[in-house]
Structure formats: C-alpha cells, structure tokens
C-alpha cells in the first residue's frame, strides 16, 4: 500500500529481488511505481487483495482502513513498513542510520563506501542515489538502511551497527495532540532512540552531542568528530565541493573531496566513515567512496538553470536543516532567493519562529502555504506561512507569501544570472523547481 512512496517502493524492489511476487496500490501512482514494472492499482479498495497473502502498509495507515480490515478478515499477514525493514536487517550483518537530520545522505555515503570496498551491499534508502541506481539495491553483503526515527516502531529494529547523526525535537506531537508518525513527547522520542541504539552491537554517535552521549552511556559506542575516534582536518568549504583530511586516532585515513557542499556534510561523512570501519571497509575504500559519492536526490540538487540563475532543490524541512542548506547555498557567492514550503501543520505551529530565524540569512524569501501531508491544525496553511513571512520582514529580510503558481511566475520573471533559486521543503515544492527549469 502506498507503493509510490520512496520507502514503500524501495521495499517492493527488494522483495522482488528475492523472488516475491509484488503488487501495489497508491492514491497517486507515479514514476517510482511505474519503474517497478508490477501491477499497481489506483486508489484503495479491499478488492485489491484477491490473490495476496501479505499486506505491507505505511505506519500512518489506521487499523480501521478498509484494506487492513479486509486483510485481517481473510487471515492475511499485515506488516507495517518498519516491521518488514526489521525483518530484512536481521538476516545479515547490517547498519541502520537514524537521526533528525542527515540520515539519507549518511546512508548514501555509507553505501558508496561499501560499493567502493567491493562488499556488495544491500541498500534501503529514503532518497534517490545514482550509484544504486534509485532508492534500493539488492546485494549479498552487509545490509545498510536508513531507519526513520519518525516511526515509533523504529525502536524494535535490530542492526549490527546503529548510527545516530543527531537528535532534535522533530516528529513530536504538541501537548494534548496525537498524530500518526509523531511521538507523544520528546522523552518518548528519546526512549525510542535508546531502544534502537541499545539493540546494536556497535553504536556510532557524534562526540560533540551531549544529548546523544547521555543517551548512549554504557552502550558499546564509537564516537566521531572532534574528540572522537575519527575527525576532519584542513576542512575547505567551496561552492561546489568540500575537501578535508580524514584522520583516525591511529593515523590518517586519506584525503576526501566531497562533491556536496556544506559543513553539515563533513559531519555526515564522518559518521559514514566510522560505520564503514565497523563493517570492515579499508581506509582507502572510505576516502575513495566518499569522494565518489554523487549526492542524493533532493539534497542540494542542482536541477538546472533559468535566466542564468541556478535552480537548486532541497528536502530541508526542519529549522536546523534549513539553516545548514542556506549556509551551503551562500558559499556560492550568489544572491540566494529561497522558495520555502513548510511541511506539516503541527511541525510548523511549533517551529514557525525557528523557521524565520533559520531563513533570515537569505537575500529574499518566498513562503508557500504549508504542505499539510493530510494533517489538521489550529491554523490554516496560509495563516502559518503568513506568520513566517511577516516575522522575516520584522527581522529586516524581504519576504512574502505566495501560492505555488504565483511563486513559479515570480521566479520565472525575476531570475537573474547572479541568483541561486533555492526551493526547500519535504512536500511538492520539488515539482515547482523542475517546472521552472523545464518550462523556462
């Protein structure tokens, strides 16, 4: 169910590689579902279950969904997405990467290293990686997966090496509210993270993160970053790449030339390097793999140009991610004009001020209505976006709210060769960036 989704389509591909007959359904089937080459039904209907013996559903699907009810009535096995992923990861030596920010990129970097090492990794990714290609790769070697901490079931996943890039208050429901894919509180999120990490043979966390250090006290952990087992020296941040010397406490591991910009990607690379060491990769494979990592789709992805301006698409949807992506964009020396689509009403209600603070370094900001992802909130998508735009104006930054078509027309009419047009958000803002380039 929901086979067009990045996670569900990846699981479908991996099941097919094991000889499992797969069908799917989705409210809006698209290119991912078509690329699988399997029967895909449009919409949801209990009649889709005629010949199946297992139904795999995304976590937010409620137990009273008609297809779930029908599946149980027929005695079919019903698995949540995370339960199926846990089944896959338990079968071989594995690494699971989680965290509020950077987990997709870090997982992709780790996959690139293991490919370079010739270890034939099995990969599950929450994004598109050209090296795979796509969002999944069958393989006979170590199993590498992005483990989404927004899903409370992630605490039950067991891996050999557990990587936590960071942990912040995201996917936490406001007091008194409940929603699928939201933890009841920050403490509930921390407890779930502890459960995931405690089940691993090796835990990889940043040495400079007091919260994760406290959470992993007493666990078999290995630390990266300043004060850890591996760190970066001679870091050079340039508009198109990031170079540094990768150092282990026992000696240098090699020179790394990342093709992706931003200091946050140094953090991600260090996490991937230490996890790769734990899985048996050589220092040479680590430095080469990181240097050949092409980036993940929608992570500072330059999709083209319009009027001489660069058009960049990024998935950032939390204030910390937004600020890191903006800082990377500013390295270009161009006038950075942000087209930001907040994602989810509950998140935006809680973090609207933090979003404004994260965006204030841009030369100009256009705020689109919140992409609700089906949520209901106390305020409308337009009102919340208005609040962010007005706060940015108070902070002295040119800002306005526009709907998607207005924003597209405005970007097209005002793009200049000195601009970098940065489209950010986890919703459908990516389609605007691509339309701008393709339609000119």
Question: What kind of region is each of these model predictions?
Answer:
Residues 1-32, 36-40, 51, 55, ...:
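ATP-dependent carboxylate-amine ligase
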Residues 137-139:
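Conserved motor-coupling elements within RecA-like helicase/translocase cores
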Residues 95-97:
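Hydrophobic anchor at the beta1->P-loop junction of P-loop NTPases
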């Amino acid at each position: 169910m929901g086979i067009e989704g990045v996670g569900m389509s990846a699981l479908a591909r991996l099941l097919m590689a094991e000889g499992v007959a797969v069908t799917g359904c989705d409210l809006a089937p698209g290119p991912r579902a078509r690329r699988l080459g399997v029967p895909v039904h449009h919409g949801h209907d209990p009649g889709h279950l005629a010949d199946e013996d297992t139904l795999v559903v995304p976590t937010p699907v409620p137990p009273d969904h008609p297809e779930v009810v029908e599946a149980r009535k027929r005695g079919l096995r019903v698995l949540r997405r995370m339960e199926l992923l846990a089944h896959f990861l338990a079968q071989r030596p594995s690494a699971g990467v989680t965290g509020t920010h950077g987990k997709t990129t870090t997982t992709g970097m780790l996959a690139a290293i293991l490919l370079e090492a010739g270890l034939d990794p099995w990969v599950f990714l929450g994004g598109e990686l050209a090296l795979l290609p796509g969002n999944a790769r069958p393989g006979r070697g170590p199993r590498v997966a992005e483990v989404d901490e927004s899903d409370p079931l992630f605490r039950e996943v067991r891996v050999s090496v557990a990587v936590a890039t960071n942990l912040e208050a995201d996917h936490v429901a406001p007091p008194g509210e409940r929603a699928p894919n939201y933890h009841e509180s920050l403490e509930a999120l921390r407890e779930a993270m502890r459960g995931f990490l405690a089940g691993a043979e090796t835990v990889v966390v940043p040495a400079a993160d007091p919260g994760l250090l406290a959470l992993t006290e007493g666990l078999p952990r290995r630390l990266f970053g300043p004060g850890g087992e591996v760190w970066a020296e001679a870091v050079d941040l340039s508009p198109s790449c990031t170079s540094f010397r990768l150092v282990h406490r026992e000696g240098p591991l090699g020179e790394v030339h990342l093709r992706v910009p931003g200091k946050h990607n140094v953090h991600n690379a260090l996490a991937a390097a230490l996890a790769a060491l734990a899985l048996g990769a050589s220092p040479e494979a680590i430095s080469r793999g990181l240097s050949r990592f092409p980036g993940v789709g929608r992570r500072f992805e330059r999709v083209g140009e319009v009027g001489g301006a660069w058009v960049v698409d990024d998935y950032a949807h939390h204030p910390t991610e937004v600020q890191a992506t903006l800082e990377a964009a500013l390295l270009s020396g161009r006038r950075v004009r942000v087209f930001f689509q907040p994602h989810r009403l509950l998140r935006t209600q809680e973090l609207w001020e933090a979003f404004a603070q994260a965006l204030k370094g841009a030369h100009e900001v256009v705020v689109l209505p919140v992409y609700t992802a089906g949520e209901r909130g106390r305020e409308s998508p337009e009102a919340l976006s208005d609040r962010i735009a007005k706060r940015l104006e108070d902070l002295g930054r040119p800002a306005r709210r526009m709907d998607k078509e207005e924003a597209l027309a405005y970007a097209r009419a005002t793009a200049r060769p000195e601009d970098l047009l940065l489209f950010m958000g986890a919703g459908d803002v990516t389609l605007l960036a691509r339309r701008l380039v393709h339609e000119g």
